[in-house]
């Protein structure tokens, strides 16, 4: 292996075992694919386990753990045991446990892959909502490209242990840098994933023939529905009440066609 893992300005690969344990205990929390809850402990005790490891009593961590259990939708479940909960509810406990630890970094290793599709979507939406509020560093590992495109601010694609491409997800989808990435993204529903901000013309000058206003974060799929399929339309692109661009429907249609590596954007 090679490379560095920089955290707070330090390469953690240089840490000894004791320092790694301290970092893991105080600076990083984890959400596991198989939940990893203690079956003989209540939901509340599982959520507060990081505090207990540090020698704090249930009385001291109960309020913090309850706050995060409530936040992830588990109000009134603190006295239940993991076996009494569904898979989705157990993973909510796992997220509450990570949040109760109050670490700056949350590592989520295939955290939602064991859940059925509907619950998985709910958990993805919950994570997006929490991240918008908390602004933590979340490292999310997944084999599901749709999930990665939905959740990631910065996407890193690996093959055989090496980084093949990394960038903002929209950029990777529009600009695959080699045949592997091109094949990797070929089956993605581009209209559902791509956002207006990725295909708009950046300008604060309104078009002369404006058909309406759209938000910079709207999906192309939603714009197609609004336009009724009229490829001659132009829209003002707004962000927080201010124009940030113009969307030409012809550019939207062009973005739906996958680009091969090396092709320049028009």
Model-predicted regions and their roles:
Residues 25, 80-83, 101:
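Conserved signature/switch motifs of ABC ATPase nucleotide-binding domains
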Residues 207-242, 247-266:
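The conserved cystathionine-beta-synthase
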């Amino acid at each position: 292996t090679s490379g560095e893992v920089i955290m707070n300005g330090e390469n953690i690969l240089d840490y000894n075992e004791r320092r790694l344990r301290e970092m893991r205990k105080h600076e990083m929390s984890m959400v596991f694919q198989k939940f990893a809850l203690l079956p003989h402990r209540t939901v509340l005790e599982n959520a507060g386990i990081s505090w207990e490891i540090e020698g704090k009593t249930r009385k001291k961590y109960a309020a913090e753990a309850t706050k995060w259990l409530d936040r992830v939708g588990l109000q009134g479940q603190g006295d239940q045991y993991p076996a009494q909960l569904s898979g989705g509810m157990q993973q909510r406990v796992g997220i509450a446990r990570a949040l109760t630890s109050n670490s700056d970094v949350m590592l989520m290793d295939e955290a939602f892959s064991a859940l059925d599709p509907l619950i998985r979507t709910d958990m993805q939406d919950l994570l997006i909502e929490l991240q918008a509020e908390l602004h933590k560093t979340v490292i999310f590992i997944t084999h599901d490209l749709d999930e990665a495109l939905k959740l990631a601010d910065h996407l890193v694609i690996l093959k055989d242990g090496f980084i093949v491409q990394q960038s903002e997800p929209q950029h990777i989808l529009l600009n695959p840098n080699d045949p592997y990435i091109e094949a990797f993204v070929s089956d993605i529903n581009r209209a559902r994933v791509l956002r207006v901000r990725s295909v708009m013309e950046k300008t604060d000058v309104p078009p002369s023939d404006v058909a309406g206003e759209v938000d910079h974060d709207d999906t192309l799929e939603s714009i197609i529905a609004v336009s009724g399929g009229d490829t001659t339309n132009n829209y003002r692109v707004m962000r927080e009440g201010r124009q940030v661009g113009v969307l030409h429907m012809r550019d939207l249609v062009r973005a739906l066609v996958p680009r091969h590596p090396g092709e320049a954007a028009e």
